């Protein structure tokens, strides 16, 4: 029986050497929220704790300034 191996998750921000996550960078932030608008946890994305906190703060700021929606499930 073949064994499947799970690819190791890595923090994209650490590998790229990002100093701080900017709340105005909507393209990057959209990769870390679900279709319904929830913030994706670090155990799924592999983001380190330092950058997960910055990411959450940036997403919340962008939501407050109406750059990102709180939810996309409006009907």
Swiss-Prot record:
RNA-binding found in the keyword field: yes
GO cellular component, one term: cytosolic small ribosomal subunit
InterPro entries, per database record: Ribosomal_bS18, Ribosomal_bS18_CS, Ribosomal_bS18_sf
Keyword annotations: Ribonucleoprotein, Ribosomal protein, RNA-binding, rRNA-binding
Domain of life: Bacteria
Cleaved signal peptide residues: none
Pfam family, one: Ribosomal_S18
Assembly and oligomerization: Part of the 30S ribosomal subunit. Forms a tight heterodimer with protein bS6.
Job of this protein: Binds as a heterodimer with protein bS6 to the central domain of the 16S rRNA, where it helps stabilize the platform of the 30S subunit.
Family annotation (NCBIfam families): S18
Name this polypeptide is given: Small ribosomal subunit protein bS18
Gene giving rise to this polypeptide: rpsR
């Amino acid at each position: 029986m073949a064994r499947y191996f799970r690819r190791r998750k890595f923090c994209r921000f650490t590998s790229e050497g990002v100093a701080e996550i900017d709340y105005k960078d909507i393209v990057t932030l959209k990769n870390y929220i679900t279709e319904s608008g929830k913030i994706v946890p670090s155990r799924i994305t592999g983001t380190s704790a330092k950058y997960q906190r910055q990411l959450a703060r940036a997403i919340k700021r962008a939501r407050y300034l109406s750059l990102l929606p709180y939810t996309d499930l409006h009907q």
